[in-house]
Amino acid sequence: QTRNFFNVGQARKFMQTTLIAAQIKELLEQNKPSISTRQLYYILKRTIAGLKENTFENQNESDPIIEDVEVSIDALREELGLEPTPKGVFSGLITYKDLRTGDEINCRKMGTAGAAIPANVEPSVMEFKKSEAKFVLVVEKFAVWNVLNQMKFWDKHKCILLTGKGQGERSARRLVSRLNKELKLPVYVFCDFDPYGYYIYSVYKQGSINLAFFSEKSGCPDAKYIGLKHDDVKEFKIPKSNFIRLTEQDLKRLKEIKNYEWFKKKEWQDEIQKAIDFGYKIESDALVSKTIEFMGETYLPKVIKDKDWLD
């Protein structure tokens, strides 16, 4: 979208863009601590002198302009002193250096809590030092990550184990992308057998529809979906007591994602249609009903070894 300085209808947006750009410039030039987009909004919100009008009425006005600035200067907000609120954790065979503090973090020795994924995982802040990992395993749910981490799955199978605790936010997705592209590590994604599990995988792989610019830098196009899959139900004898009937909303969502461009491959069309016909969904947590160790000792090693995945 082009903004014209002489277009009165765009004057407010132009003013807001200038305010945000000036504040970012100050953050960088004065080497101030990074702030959140919410904090940026509060810094810039005020009543304009001589007018009964605020610079910003709510954060819904400032957020899209931040995206515009990112695209305009080809820089992520994390590089501009603006950081998201992370929620993911990871563990495994990697050491990285926090270039702000000089600390080295060994993710092999973070205990049952794991290492928090930093808000800013850009190379200017997070430098990969040592890794013997052979792949990255991304799991949808923290509960699944927690079991695998306690089993030290990452040690036995030489990997980095990561969860975004549901939908991966910016820093989790960007970290996975960096591990894949810079360390040349394959990425395997383990989610629930339901439309939202499929979608979470697609966001790690292709990025978010709403953030195309960020998706170019955070997508992981060769990520593999290793489960749960429809055919796993029979192969691994998942008991019917673990089935949850699909809701009308679930069925609607399955039909929607079946039409997404990145799910057009025959293997995905078949998988989604099988899910619709099956009529049930299954959570990845349900594998513990066989034994608590089943997913870490049997399911995951087998599907990875057999390359039983969807691309």
Q: What residues fall within each predicted segment?
A:
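Nucleic-acid enzyme cleavage-core boundary/entry regions
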Residues: Q1-P186, P195-D311
